[in-house]
């Protein structure tokens, strides 16, 4: 466990995605879905959509698929 004031930490979140850019896009899109009324998968004290989205990513409820051909 680290002493980060932010929970979950960026280090933990980056284990779930390819890079910081992907994390920003994924969390923003998920937050938008929550704003639009999507079901949430975690129980957190905050009612802020972005906080909920980040916690969902950290707990593995939200994934993404890289559609770019390499």
From Swiss-Prot:
Gene3D superfamilies assigned to the protein according to its UniProt record, in alphabetical order: 3.90.940.10
Biological role stated in the UniProt entry: Promotes RNA polymerase assembly. Latches the N- and C-terminal regions of the beta' subunit thereby facilitating its interaction with the beta and alpha subunits.
Classification via SMART domains: RNA_pol_Rpb6
Substrates-to-products reaction catalysed: RNA(n) + a ribonucleoside 5'-triphosphate = RNA(n+1) + diphosphate
Protein species of origin: Clostridium perfringens (strain 13 / Type A)
PANTHER family: DNA-DIRECTED RNA POLYMERASE SUBUNIT OMEGA
Gene Ontology BP terms: DNA-templated transcription
Gene name as annotated: rpoZ
Family the UniProt entry places it in: Belongs to the RNA polymerase subunit omega family.
Record SUPFAM superfamilies: RPB6/omega subunit-like
Name of the protein in question: DNA-directed RNA polymerase subunit omega
A UniProt-annotated Pfam family: RNA_pol_Rpb6
Leading EC class: transferase
A GO term for molecular function: DNA-directed RNA polymerase activity
InterPro entries, sorted: DNA-dir_RNA_pol_omega (IPR003716), Pol_omega/Rpo6/RPB6 (IPR006110), RPB6/omega-like_sf (IPR036161)
EC number: 2.7.7.6
A cellular-component GO term for this protein: DNA-directed RNA polymerase complex
Subunit composition and interactions: The RNAP catalytic core consists of 2 alpha, 1 beta, 1 beta' and 1 omega subunit. When a sigma factor is associated with the core the holoenzyme is formed, which can initiate transcription.
Keyword vocabulary terms for this entry: DNA-directed RNA polymerase, Nucleotidyltransferase, Transcription, Transferase
């Amino acid at each position: 466990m680290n002493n980060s004031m932010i929970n979950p930490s960026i280090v933990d979140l980056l284990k779930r995605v390819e890079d910081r850019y992907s994390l920003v896009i994924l969390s923003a899109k998920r937050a938008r879905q929550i704003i639009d009324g999507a079901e949430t998968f975690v129980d957190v004290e905050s009612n802020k959509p972005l906080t909920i989205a980040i916690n969902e990513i950290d707990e593995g409820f939200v994934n993404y698929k890289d559609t770019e051909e390499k």
